[in-house]
């Protein structure tokens, strides 16, 4: 099971079918991909604050091929564990990424990202799609 983070979504929306995301999708075309709803929120917020970027509904339709991973009670608890571990290791990451890591780790998915800081999260399998 693979879940994408915000960097993947932004790159998908801006690549125009060519680039690292397109290559990744071509290599994994038979696998379903999941998007944490928190990552979707981050992308939707970008639309609201960008000039001429369309609407949240338009963006949601462009991303409807992704399965959703909701933020649940179990993922909330997992995110607290992630934050505690990162703090103990002296490697904090931003709050929203802690929550995304909690969602993904709780369901046992791999996180598809180009953000290196997710590698600091114990027991979170990170798959890089771009360097």
Where do the PLM segments sit?
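Histidine- and aromatic-rich ligand-binding microenvironments
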Residues: 5, 35-36, 93-94, 115
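Acidic catalytic patch
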Residues: 67-87
């Amino acid at each position: 099971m693979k879940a994408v983070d915000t960097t993947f979504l932004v790159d998908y929306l801006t690549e125009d079918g060519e680039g690292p995301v397109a290559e990744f999708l071509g290599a994994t075309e038979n696998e379903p991909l999941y998007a944490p709803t928190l990552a979707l929120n981050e992308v939707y917020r970008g639309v609201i604050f960008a000039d001429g970027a369309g609407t949240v509904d338009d963006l949601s339709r462009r991303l409807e091929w992704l399965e959703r991973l909701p933020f649940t009670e179990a993922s909330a608890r997992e995110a607290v564990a992630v934050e505690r571990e990162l703090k103990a290791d002296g490697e904090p990451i931003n709050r929203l990424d802690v929550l995304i890591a909690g969602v993904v780790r709780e369901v046992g998915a791999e996180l598809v990202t180009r953000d290196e800081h997710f590698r600091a999260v114990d027991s979170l399998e990170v798959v890089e799609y771009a360097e």
